[in-house]
Amino acid sequence: VEKSKVSEKMGKLPLVIYSHGGSSTNIDNTALLQEIAAQGYMVMAIDYNFSLEAYGLTMEDATTLTVEAQKKFINQLVERTVPNQVDDIIYGLKEIQSTSFPLAKHIDFENIAYLGHSLGGTTSINASNRATPAKAVINMDGPIDPNTITKIKSPILYLSSYSPDLPDKILEGKGLPDANLYREVKKYELGNVTQLFDTRQDDAFWLRFKHAGHVDFTDVPFMIPMMTTDGYDKQQGHRLRTEVIIDFLNAYLKEGSTFEKIEDHSLAWIK
């Protein structure tokens, strides 16, 4: 950071705060974050040093493959981890606003967006209520905390993976050993997403990447090709995801831009 250089001609830059998913790190979306930074944003990616044990959870909780067990695990994960991660965001913001932080003078702290994947998406939405108010929030395939549904006021973009209503054969071809288990758990998650969008009339967008799996919203498929979901074009998917996200950020954090829905055969706008 000490050696980073920002052109004075740029003025103060909008800030995007990235939150990674559980059991991941803050480098899991480096390609996307570099693209965002290149468009004139300051980016802060927080590493939460996540572990199940730190929150009183176990690997058995995460891997008990029944619908009720997975619902319980999702709820416990959100209830126990997200408040702590939002505290980390609040602390991080305080630190970088300090005059001793080399880049503080280049950041527009009134112009902030929260972006996250999976549990980090949940964290991002909750941060928009508890931390510095957000001009925009982006959740990439993460759960929605039911306690925040009526509280979210910021413009929101939700990106979701392939539909749980696909036939068993297709779901199994995507590496799911139990298509029905996935279907029921995913529908449970999306129930809260649906409730959120039912309460919002303006500045709320829900986009499905029809062939993408959960991990495809990160850099992992590029680092470990075998992790790419069957039927998903990761090159095209990354390009489209980056374009949609940057267009959304530009519309709400920069003057003179409007958000237009990108059309492609691999995308489905739910709202």
Model regions and ranges:
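Active-site machinery of serine-nucleophile hydrolases
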Residues: 27-69, 210
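Domain-level recognition of soluble alpha/beta enzyme cores
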Residues: 1-15
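Primarily recognizes the serine-hydrolase "nucleophile elbow" in alpha/beta-hydrolase
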Residues: 92-152
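The feature captures the conserved acid-bearing segment of alpha/beta-hydrolase catalytic domains
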Residues: 135-213
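Glycine-rich His-Gly loop
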Residues: 18-22, 118, 161-162
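Alpha/beta-hydrolase active-site loop
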Residues: 50, 56-109
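Alpha/beta-hydrolase-fold serine-hydrolase catalytic core, especially in secreted/extracellular enzymes
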Residues: 24, 201-204, 209-271
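Short beta-strand element of the alpha/beta-hydrolase
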Residues: 11-21, 34, 157
